[in-house]
Swiss-Prot record:
Protein family per UniProt: Belongs to the UPF0213 family.
Domain GIY-YIG: 5-80
Domain of life: Bacteria
Pfam families: GIY-YIG
Protein name: UPF0213 protein LMOf2365_0181
InterPro entries registered for this protein in UniProt: GIY-YIG_endonuc, GIY-YIG_endonuc_sf, UPF0213_domain
Origin species: Listeria monocytogenes serotype 4b (strain F2365)
Amino acid sequence: MAKASEHFFYVLKCSDNSYYGGYTTDVIRREAEHNAGIRCKYTKTRRPVKVIHFEKFETRSEATKAEAAFKKLSRKNKDAYLIQREESE
C-alpha cells in the first residue's frame, strides 16, 4: 500500500492499444478503479486496461508535470519514451 506522501505518474495501455497517462497516490488501486469504470471517462470504453509504466515522485507537482508532458507527446514519441524508460530500468 502506498503512503500518502508518494506520488505517481502512470501509463495504462487500453484494450484499443491507446495509452492513458494519469496521476495517483496508489497505482494498484487506480488500475482497479479504471477497470471497474470508476472516475474515468477515457478508459471506461477501453477496458480492460493494464499499467505498463509508472514513476514515483516526491511531490504531486512533479508527478502531474510528468503526466502533462506525456500527454502532449505524439503516439510515436510516447512509444519512444516508454521504450527508453524500460531500457533504463
